[in-house]
Amino acid sequence: MEMTQAVLYIAGALMMGLGALGAAVGIGVLGGRFLEGAARQPELIPMLRTQFFIVMGLVDAVPMIAVGLAMYVLFAVAG
């Protein structure tokens, strides 16, 4: 039973850690592309900003789901 709980704790930690890492990389790339597009065509900044925030929310939603599942694994399944 102890080994099973340890594996579940490690799985939950990996889900949260890798989810945060993936979101950070994704938002960093997205922000870089936004700045690149804004520098090339400044007149499109309002449209680009709207699209940037929509896509940033979608990129950030997947890690939040992973964090929710990790909390479930840590507190409901392993606890």
UniProtKB/Swiss-Prot annotation:
F-type ATPases have 2 components, F(1) - the catalytic core - and F(0) - the membrane proton channel. F(1) has five subunits: alpha(3), beta(3), gamma(1), delta(1), epsilon(1). F(0) has three main subunits: a(1), b(2) and c(10-14). The alpha and beta chains form an alternating ring which encloses part of the gamma chain. F(1) is attached to F(0) by a central stalk formed by the gamma and epsilon chains, while a peripheral stalk is formed by the delta and b chains. It is found in: Cell inner membrane. It comes from Thiobacillus denitrificans (strain ATCC 25259 / T1). Belongs to the ATPase C chain family. Keywords: ATP synthesis, Cell inner membrane, Cell membrane, CF(0), Hydrogen ion transport, Ion transport, Lipid-binding, Membrane, Transmembrane, Transmembrane helix, Transport. SUPFAM superfamilies: F1F0 ATP synthase subunit C. GO terms for cellular component: plasma membrane; proton-transporting ATP synthase complex; proton-transporting two-sector ATPase complex, proton-transporting domain. Coiled coil: none annotated. This is ATP synthase subunit c.
